[in-house]
Amino acid sequence: MKRDDLIFDIIEKEHQRQLKGIELIASENFVSDQVMQAMGSCLTNKYAEGYPGKRYYGGCEVVDQSEQIAIDRLKQIFGAEWANVQPHSGAQANAAVFLAVLNPGDKFMGLNLAHGGHLSHGSLVNTSGIIYTPCEYNLNKETGRVDYDQMEEIALREKPKMIIGGGSAYSREWDYKRMREIADKVGAILMIDMAHPAGLIAAGLLDNPVKYAHIVTSTTHKTLRGPRGGVIMMGKDFPNPWGKKTPKGEIKMMSQLLDSAVFPGIQGGPLEHVIAAKAVAFGECLQPEYKEYQTQVKKNAAVLAQALIDRGFTIVSGGTDNHSMLVDLRTKYPDLTGKVAEKALVAADITVNKNMVPFDSRSAFQTSGIRLGTPAITTRGAKEDLMLEIAEMIETVLSNVDNEEVIAQVRARVNETMKKYPIFAY
């Protein structure tokens, strides 16, 4: 076959973009060479519908081994009794939990998307909000933190069948214990989506929801620093509370419902090359350098947030406990939208994403905020001193969004600075 130079030239362009720029998108990271090698391996050739030891195809005895290693390592990292590593993404993992727990039209609670929630937690344009009935809880307007008292009031009033914790733009620790107490009061299943802070949790730097929640989902990229994919876990398996039975009349365990929801519920064949890459990444999580890396992620985020605050920016909730922060632009730049801010920063090779902020008057296409995170830049070896420089460059760009000369100067500075940092330092 002739080499597809068109696509490989594009891949090289993307490689150069990643090398030259400062990556601050909170959900992005750089994986190790061995994770990429597993992703590009011959395992991509193998169909393996089903689970290890119970497949619908022959010749699965080898991929059974790699998938079982992924399961065992994931359980070891988070102290889970049961895990499923087959979901193709975090949203797929969430969809599988919905399928296992809810019937169409059933009510559930999730964090308001504009307050830092996620599309798959009840957005009306997502299957979670189309098939099921969402109700929202919010951040406290004064503190910018989850209002657990309001959450309890809403739960007692609405009686949801499931309560979801976790989000895509929330920089504070979650009170999983309080959430479990609320869920137990109303007889709800507590599902925690820890996609964003999973790596920090794996390193023991944030509280572990597996100890409290009925079910935990996550992506395997972001802070966890693996290939793009999803997982589902339970700290302890339990009989399903709705009395669903096997053909033999035995009460099904929750793990059986979840396994069936993933396959054949929402997926067919698993991506065994991705699962092998997940296993490699989980192995990296168990190495001592991983905790060093995650500790630096947290330090860098705290320093970047404070440096921005010192320059007059508003950070929702006043700071960060994890890898991310949500910058409310309205205080410092009342007329600047997140869309324009993102475009200007990207032009300077500082990659961020526009994001709605709590009580935002602008649409999701314009927004009044930008979301920042430190996982990717920390993987490259950045320390606190670079965070101070980044805060300065962000302010320079956002104060000159229409000045192409200033943006070009910042871009040149970014490109020169990043020559000192390899793509993967930890």
Swiss-Prot record:
Any GO CC annotation of this UniProt entry: cytosol
Annotated site location: Plays an important role in substrate specificity: H221
Modified residues (N6-(pyridoxal phosphate)lysine): K222
Cofactors, names only: pyridoxal 5'-phosphate
GO terms of biological process kind: glycine biosynthetic process from serine; tetrahydrofolate interconversion
Family the UniProt entry places it in: Belongs to the SHMT family.
HAMAP family reported for this sequence: SHMT
UniProt name for this protein: Serine hydroxymethyltransferase
Organism: Phocaeicola vulgatus (strain ATCC 8482 / DSM 1447 / JCM 5826 / CCUG 4940 / NBRC 14291 / NCTC 11154)
Lineage: Bacteria, Pseudomonadati, Bacteroidota, Bacteroidia, Bacteroidales
